[in-house]
């Protein structure tokens, strides 16, 4: 993993291109049709528009298998690149190094090569984890020479007399990096009937109207990181398409939109296509035994069915390997662990040291 481009090792961008050229495939992602032109335009302009994502793997004596790609609004960067690095520097006396020790430098390098504007608004929800995640990215931006401001929630945003989007200091909002998932904005679009509009229903700027997430992220003049096209590789509907395009790829798991004969024989994981944080996942054995189940807010979504490939249990915890992509390349690795088979938002980040032999 250290020596190759993760985007090249897993043909996920090839699959993304295939989806965006085929209406029948794109329909599988449950994205409102009113956004399809925006999606395709975002993909056409993709060069230097993606900063970072995270791939989640299972790695054991059987080899390496990818579960999914968090291409949009990935997290765990702070824990891997800062907290564990401090531990490695001050609390660890053995050999080896933290494999995410250079993550902040990689992020800064990606920002330097991006097409971001000189001032970046960092948009986050009012969440403790997102607080430090936003601060870590702000440090990378500062290192890359950008000015920035963190916006917690949308309360500070408003319209000026000319109908432009501004922050509490009166600064124009035209470039943002977000911790919000694109799916949150897409859900806002779903709440408005598509038949009522010939264009994306964003507000154009009346001083008495509140600013919604879609009014920021879907404004044509606002450059957004991560870009809209990342909802395609970040949506689990990409996984059956990857398997169809590259069956038996050594890093992929058999995945389908139904429980096919092979999945019935191996057991399978049931996952909502736009689910997050390990929510609403069922693990079913080849004997139809429910091995684990999580709850959440994604129960109404379409599901995919992925070959059962359980995490290894090491010292009482099931351990997952997470690898960060930065500009499409390897940026670092961390481990997540849980006493249950499914890694969730509250699952631990485990210490990791790599020793070269």
Pin down the residues of each PLM region.
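Extracellular structured ligand-interaction cores
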Residues: 7, 52-54, 320
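Single conserved hydrophobic/aromatic residue that forms the stacking wall/gate
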Residues: 1-8
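Extended, Lys/Arg-enriched charged tracts that mediate electrostatic binding to polyanionic substrates
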Residues: 19-55, 129-131, 135, 139, ...
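Short acidic, Gly/Ser-rich segments with clustered Asp/Glu that frequently serve as metal-coordination loops
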Residues: 42-65, 69-77, 231
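Domain-scale recognition of functional cores that engage charged ligands
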Residues: 60-61, 73-79, 84-357
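Short Gly/Pro-enriched turn/cap motifs at secondary-structure boundaries
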Residues: 1, 44-48, 273, 312-314
């Amino acid at each position: 993993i250290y020596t190759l481009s993760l985007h090249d090792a897993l043909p996920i961008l090839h699959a993304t291109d295939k989806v965006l050229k085929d209406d029948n495939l794109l329909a599988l992602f449950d994205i409102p049709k009113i956004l399809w032109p925006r999606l395709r335009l975002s993909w056409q302009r993709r060069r230097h528009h993606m900063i970072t994502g995270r791939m989640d793997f299972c790695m054991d004596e059987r080899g390496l298998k990818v579960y999914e790609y968090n291409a949009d609004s990935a997290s765990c960067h702070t824990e891997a690149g800062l907290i564990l690095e401090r531990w490695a520097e001050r609390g660890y006396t053995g050999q080896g190094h933290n494999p995410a020790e250079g993550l902040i430098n990689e992020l800064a390098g990606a920002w330097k090569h991006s097409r971001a504007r000189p001032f970046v608004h960092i948009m986050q929800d009012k969440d403790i984890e997102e607080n430090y995640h936003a601060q870590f990215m702000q440090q990378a931006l500062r290192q890359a020479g950008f000015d920035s401001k963190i916006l917690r929630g949308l309360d500070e945003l408003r319209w000026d007399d000319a109908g432009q989007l501004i922050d509490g200091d009166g600064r124009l909002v035209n470039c943002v990096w977000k911790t919000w998932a694109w799916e949150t904005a897409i859900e806002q679009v779903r709440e408005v009937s598509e038949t009522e509009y010939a264009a994306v229903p964003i507000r154009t700027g009346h001083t008495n109207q509140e600013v919604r997430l879609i009014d920021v992220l879907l404004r044509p003049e606002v450059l957004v990181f991560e870009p809209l096209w990342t909802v395609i590789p970040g949506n689990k509907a990409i996984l059956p398409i990857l398997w169809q395009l590259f069956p038996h790829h050594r890093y992929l798991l058999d995945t389908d939109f139904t429980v096919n004969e092979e999945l019935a024989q191996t057991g399978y994981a049931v996952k909502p296509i736009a689910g997050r944080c390990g929510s609403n996942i069922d693990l079913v054995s080849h004997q139809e035994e429910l091995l684990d189940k999580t709850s959440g807010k994604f129960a109404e979504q379409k599901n995919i069915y992925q070959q059962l490939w359980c995490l290894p249990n090491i010292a009482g915890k099931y351990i997952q390997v997470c690898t960060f992509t930065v500009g499409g390349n390897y940026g670092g690795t961390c481990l997540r662990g849980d006493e249950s088979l499914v890694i969730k938002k509250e699952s631990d980040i485990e210490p990791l040291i790599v020793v070269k032999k």
